[in-house]
Swiss-Prot record:
InterPro entries: FAM180. This is Protein FAM180B. It comes from the Eukaryota. Residues 1-23 form the signal peptide. It is found in: Secreted. The keyword Secreted applies. Keywords: Secreted, Signal. The keyword Transport does not apply. One of its GO terms (cellular component) is extracellular region.
């Protein structure tokens, strides 16, 4: 399970780096934009900064909140920004995550996600990985794994907009076995 968690975290971090090379712009009607994020969050962090913060590791506390493990990094402006995003904009339960996923699926035929929404999507996926790892019951692990797989598919959909033939992203295919909580 630890190797799977490490692989999934590395996958999300790699996708975070990919988000830095996308050229998506905010669009009206998106689930979140820079005006709804709050005063100190005017634009997403550079991918290398986000990579450093995530590489330091996160921990899930007893209240279900994710925190940066490295206190020094957590005290920096980017660290405080990430903490704010994780606490106030990334769903902390299955129902909230499923609602966010439904909003993304409703937007699938539209333009690429804004930079804010793409970052939100990636952080929600990362949150799923930690919650999957912390889940104690098989049924809950299965639901978190399913939601993570769907978020990964939405990430591929968004990255593929305008590039993939017939607007169809590559399938998760063999990745599904990695995400299976019942090996």
């Amino acid at each position: 399970m630890a190797a799977t968690l490490q692989f999934l975290v590395c996958l999300v971090v790699a996708i975070c780096l990919l988000s830095g090379v996308t050229t998506t712009q905010p669009h009206a009607g998106q689930p979140m934009d820079s005006t709804s994020v709050g005063g100190g969050l005017q634009e997403p962090e550079a991918p290398e900064v986000m990579f450093e913060l995530l590489w330091a590791g996160l921990e899930l506390d007893v209240m279900g909140q994710l925190h940066i493990q490295d206190e020094e990094l957590a005290s920096t402006h980017p660290g405080r920004r990430l903490r704010l995003l994780l606490q106030h904009h990334v769903p902390s339960d299955l129902e909230g995550t499923e609602q966010w996923l439904q909003q993304l699926q409703d937007l699938r035929k539209g333009p690429p996600l804004s930079t804010w929404d793409f970052e939100h999507l990636l952080l929600t996926g990362l949150s799923c990985v930690y919650r999957l790892h912390a889940a104690s019951e098989a049924e809950e692990r299965g639901r978190w794994a399913q939601v993570f797989a769907l978020l990964a598919q939405e990430t591929l959909w968004d990255l593929c907009k305008g590039f993939c033939p017939q607007d169809r992203p590559p399938s998760l295919g063999s990745w599904a076995s990695i995400l299976d909580p019942f090996p």
